[in-house]
């Protein structure tokens, strides 16, 4: 699109919103700027401009990128300003699943405009900004708690605690570069597939170092990102929400020049177990990749769901079901690789064969079972003495934890040499490139929110 002039559609004359169709690193996108007078306070016309911008992106099938700094609805306009925000929110919802929507917080963003962040596919926050629905004054009135703006809704908090921020950056220039890179992995809209690029990293490059990263013992810790870096192009990972729910890694990458979404248990954080935040993180990422036609590659090394009264009381059942729901309805190419342990319900929801993946691979070190050998023996043979339990554990491992047994039973397609992981994944993605699934028409699914 180089050489095509920008098209300014709405200026900020008398308001806080401007938008245009612009070139962003070779991609035509609808760019919205929410700022301007009165610290970006939204008046009724601003809400209408936001709605028109979202509608333009949807109708023209172009990604929607919003830069926001807003103090909320203009109080002197009365309830009409809130009505305008509602109109905008409805149009942003209509963009969901149609075009990629990326928000960048460039300054303080509060009240209704902050809620728009929750409607975005990806959120970038400049490090010295903050965002919240109810401000520090309201918190003090209702709870008596004294908080700073940063303490209540700073970029660091949203990156590590709430999960609202997928990325934080130093400034607007870094945000522009990051957004351009994110868009390079994505199509313009849901009816396109992501465009690949030439790859100088050979797809048949051996990866013997990958197996060396994973400890021989089932309980040894390691950073799964080191394994991912071994198998993707040039070792490059772009990891949204890297600081939130660190027990599950999600990342954009490419294999053989083909953009993919990666999901992986992280053994160095709570043994790679799934808790509420990890389930939310994984489900949202899987759903995002599915709607924008990014193939999914899942790397499994988990001992199950994280146990505890607090999680059960907060709804672990509902949130764990989100992972199952997201994978089960995904129609993009799906390849799963078990690196080491894969136990219990978490084994099933991490895109197992029974969630409907296309190709199921395993390393020779894989252990696929209801639980680990030691725990199983303690339940099945409670009366056994210590010496007997050692033999029983060994027998259980040989009989049930062997990946070749899983392959014989159809739970695994192939047990692969770790040194061939990159080439095996590249070959699988090539075979699945033409995959298309028809989905029965229905109004919409009822996601377990």
Q: Where do the language-model regions lie?
A:
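Ligand-binding clefts of soluble mixed alpha/beta catalytic domains
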Residues: 1-449
